[in-house]
């Protein structure tokens, strides 16, 4: 027998079972709930490179003076090629407004206290921005990243002078060399 919705009795029972299973799974999820606006800790901007997603999350639990519990579900995350390099380097000028508009929104909604800009070693976007020679060894790479990270800090400070800014270069093992 079909219902007016085109579902037979067995299909209807399967839909009901799926709904019960979904409700059961939802009830097992952590009950932590936050408002869309409020007082949150930070905004992290970093690169799209999949090698650094877990390492970046782990780093966020190690920031001096901020416990992992304080950061869990308590920071905005903006990901773009090159991370903070993508937000300021002329090679990626068409992306700049998107990042700065997002920062404005998270400042307005989330009342963040700091911005954390992390670039990383062996970054393809950095190579595109700076040229292969500028990142051909660790010293050159550090100098190129440092220049963009300084520009990033200056731009954040100009737009939002009350925010603190942490910048660094993440190594492929997850260690971050703080810059600035």
Regions found by a protein language model. Name each.
Residues 15-20, 34-93, 170-176:
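Short, conserved "active-site rim" segments that organize catalytic pockets and cofactor/ligand binding
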